[in-house]
Amino acid sequence: MTQMTVQVVTPDGIKYDHHAKCISVTTPDGEMGILPNHINLIAPLQVHEMKIRRGGEDEKVDWIAINGGIIEIKDNVVTVVADSAERDRDIDVSRAERAKLRAEREIAQAETTHNIDEVRRAKVALRRALNRINVSKK
C-alpha cells in the first residue's frame, strides 16, 4: 500500500517525521482527510489536533496539537509548518491547565475594560491551551 511521508516542523525543529496512510487536519474550511496520492495543495491550518494513522500491522495512531500554520501536500510528502506543535505524549498537562486558567482570567479582565484586542489574544491563548489538553487525553 502506498504511504505518505509526514513531517511537522516548528521554529524549534522537526517535531514529527514518520510514514502514514491517513491524516486528518483542520483548515478554516473544516476538517480535511488526506490519503496517499492526494492532489498537491497548500492550505492554512487552524489551532486543532492532527490525527496521523500510520501504516503497518499495528495501525498506530499519533496525535499532535497543532497551533496554527500551513500544510503542504506534494508527491506523497505532507509537510506541516506550524508556530508550535506537541505530540500527545510530550504535552505538560499541568502547564496547559495553568495556561487555560490564565487565558480565562485575561478574557474576563479584557472584557471588563472592553479591550477587544486583548480579548481576541486571550481567546487564541485559550484555544491553544484547550487544544493541548484535548490532545493529551487521546
From Swiss-Prot:
CDD domains, sorted: F1-ATPase_delta
Alphabetized Gene3D superfamilies for the sequence: ATP synthase delta/epsilon subunit, C-terminal domain (1.20.5.440), F0F1 ATP synthase delta/epsilon subunit, N-terminal (2.60.15.10)
UniProt family annotation: Belongs to the ATPase epsilon chain family.
GO cellular component, one term: plasma membrane
Keywords associated with the record: ATP synthesis, Cell membrane, CF(1), Hydrogen ion transport, Ion transport, Membrane, Transport
Identification of the protein by name: ATP synthase epsilon chain
Organism: Streptococcus pyogenes serotype M49 (strain NZ131)
Location(s), subcellular: Cell membrane
Primary localization: membrane
Classification via PANTHER family: ATP SYNTHASE DELTA/EPSILON CHAIN, ATP SYNTHASE EPSILON CHAIN, CHLOROPLASTIC
Subunit structure: F-type ATPases have 2 components, CF(1) - the catalytic core - and CF(0) - the membrane proton channel. CF(1) has five subunits: alpha(3), beta(3), gamma(1), delta(1), epsilon(1). CF(0) has three main subunits: a, b and c.
